């Protein structure tokens, strides 16, 4: 099998990188050299601005020339071009039993050694040059990972080298690394007639079940329904598979349900009968903010008043204090225009998805079409 070697273009970019040595090659970043911040219970790492421009160019080149050519499993949905959260939940709508399993510490559980072992199939282990003795593989691994120092706020992974959440290529790399686990899980599910999809650290499984007694397929809740995915044995099987590469289940986030499953503002209305079509629904909360914004615009309030009523956000600092008023007027207008355009794209994406999969309620589609019309009208008046 042909293995990748770093191109002259990429090596030229690396030569401009602050942490590249003409003798030792790419040096691994440490947590002291990036910005650390908490996002809930997760820790995000952002490269500092003094080297980010070159860092980003290297990321783009790595993706375009190498990582985009490495296969991932079809069950992986997150960070995949052309796929959305709808692709994560839609395959499950014609099933009745659901279980969502969350992986604990997903990104930091992907160590430099795990990446090296996986990427060994794709990147050459020969030296970059007669002068740079570092291998092509080690250069890539060092660039992608982060050494967590004892001074880091990440108490769970101190003195470890991890795939950092927040780095541009980490999502893509995670799908490549997880491919082996995805394949093993997929094979298990194929044997048991279970549907499986994965959105980053969220594993979603569904199946139809056996109906006992006098229950009908139309019943929504009955103890006589049964499915293997709701058993401890199934969870234990997934736990053992994840452990192959050092991943662990977050037991507190396991969700089991029958007929209906709600995840992140989306609901799957399942079916246990081939004659009944399952559906996807979007929570009213997601559309209410659109309706609220349109209502405020119809009341002809100022962009500033609408911004503070509909959105919570920190205000930027004007570069020129003397032009403060114009700066904020432009800011509020652009924010509202961007929100309207974003909501419009979101609604259109749902309609297009429904045209392909026929998975939304017809009344919901009519509602989205009306909202798009109102957004178009609002944008034409701005």
Predicted regions and their residues:
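Long, contiguous secondary-structure blocks with strong helical propensity
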Residues: 181, 186-194, 208
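Right-hand nucleic-acid polymerase module
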Residues: 1-101, 106-117, 121-131, 141-167, ...
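Short beta-strand-to-loop capping motifs
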Residues: 205-211
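Conserved binding-pocket/active-site segment within a compact domain
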Residues: 173
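Active-site-proximal polar cores
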Residues: 170
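Short beta-strand
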Residues: 195-199, 253
